[in-house]
Amino acid sequence: MMDNKDLEAEIHPLKNEDKKSQENPGNLPRNEDNLKSKPVPSRLSRCRTVAFFLSLFTCLFVVFVLSFIIPCPDRPSSQGTWKLDYNNAVMYDFLALGDINKDKVQDVLFLYKNTNSSNNLTRSCADEGFSTPCAFVVAVSGANGSVLWERPVAQDVALVKCAMPQTLDSDEVSSACIVVGRAGSFVAVSFFTGETLWSHPSSFSGNVSILSPLLQVPDIDGDGDGTPDLLILAQEGQEVSGALYSGSTGYQIGHRGSLGVDGDGVALLHVTRTGAQYILLPCASALCGFSVKSLYERITGRDGHFKEDPYWENMLNHSVHRRLLHRLGAVRYLMNIPGKAGQDLLLVTSEACVLLDGQDLEPRWTLGEVQVLRKPILGHYKPDTLAVVIENGTSIDRQILLLDLSTGSILWSQPLPSLPGGPPSTSLMTADHRSAFFFWGLHDLVSTNEMDPPDVQHSLYMFHPTLPGILLELANVSANIVAFDAVLLEPSRHAAYVLLTGPASSDVPGLVSVTKHKVQDLVPGSRVIHLGEGSSDSDQAIRDRFSRLRYRSEM
């Protein structure tokens, strides 16, 4: 039988525990401490838990909505190659780029001269008051080559400049193409639609030679819209004069004024370290200068908010015929170059190539005994370090020189024969902060003397500084090249070149073409040219390295 104590404990367990606690009073505080040490769930902690899970589910819901319910915008389907032909036409040496249809792919603008446009639905020469043939401006899609808009703009074009939109919401006036006709027409058309923004006759007569380029100066017409105003230089006899026009309305500001120089060649607008603007112009064997402030006061008769540089004014006042530099030889090219504290000047003459300090015009370096064939271009041979490309020598004896812009030292050189009047070189920034360079030359780099000019083809070569002993021949072109540029149609992913071809003489119309080729599509079928010993990679491995190049926009 069960003991009485055990039976009582089974029937009254709590009572039994009370007896044990009375028998062992020393154990009581320890048990109370254990009870106190156990955390008690609070209302605050429960609220925090609820808030955490609520936030988590909200984030997951938003991700779900954005990923599956709201459709992503369609990326434009970009064709690797497209071509547009015009019969019985003449092509102008002009190319411009910008996102016209706002599909985030750069589109192409160009000029050609023809009896009528390619699209029968667009306006004819007669619709705009021109006789045939006349000049048309055309905007085509960079993605597929379709015509976005096309219209006649002048009887014949002397100057054209397009102000590209900086943002997607840029207004029409600040995003326009300005066209100066040889017969006195002066028109601005919308960059996006081709519609006329304003049109006026210019103040230049038919016997005046209009000098390039069309210069832009800060907004001075007092309308306060911030649109840059326009400066056109013209030469009549030996005298150079200038006229200012409002960029927003096209109306002339004041009257024409003489610069007091007998300049010739291409003008340049230069900004000194003090912010003063000067018009630089080759004149005989010298470099002449004239301040924008003086020109504005001369043509309007009132003071402007422009600056004059005391150092430059002192040089001009102590010179004859406003000459800044003397005994230079024939000035062929003049360029503004980014410097450490502002703009420097790259001056190319018949005798030398000189980098001048942009303030005191002292030489930083000189490359003598050169015969520069074409206008220099800039690129990056080393990461984030500017280099300048010089094409030295005659066409058959041409040599490509890459110079360090800060010192003038030669970084890379390569003989590359070309045809007379060949297209210029260009460069594209790559993701490694260097540049891919594109040069035109002859297909056969060795036996050029045995070729007849009609049988010779232009070849496009690609070079990257990470492979200094390699040239990649991308394409061959037998037609006459009017204009060329390598461009980034889409950020980081769509490098291409655009080519304008047509008759060599503007007096003989013929077939003209606009062609786009994606660079990456040309690399697999390219020809690898080894310039010397040192590369152990196979041709296919080299092509693969060029295919992996990624491009970036220059800031």
From Swiss-Prot:
Positions of the UniProt region annotated as Disordered: 1-40
Transmembrane spans: 50-70
Residues bearing attached sugar chains per UniProt: 116, 120, 317, 392, 476
Biased composition (Basic and acidic residues): 1-22
InterPro entries to which the protein is assigned, alphabetical: FAM234 (IPR045232), FAM234A_B_beta-prop (IPR055409), Quinoprotein_ADH-like_sf (IPR011047)
Positions in the Cytoplasmic compartment: 1-49
Cellular compartment(s): Membrane
Cell division recorded as keyword: no
UniProt keyword annotations, A-Z: Glycoprotein, Membrane, Phosphoprotein, Signal-anchor, Transmembrane, Transmembrane helix
One Pfam assignment: Beta-prop_FAM234A_B
GO CC terms in record: cell surface; membrane
Source domain of life: Eukaryota
Family that this chain belongs to: Belongs to the FAM234 family.
Entry protein name: Protein FAM234A
Organism expressing this protein natively: Mus musculus
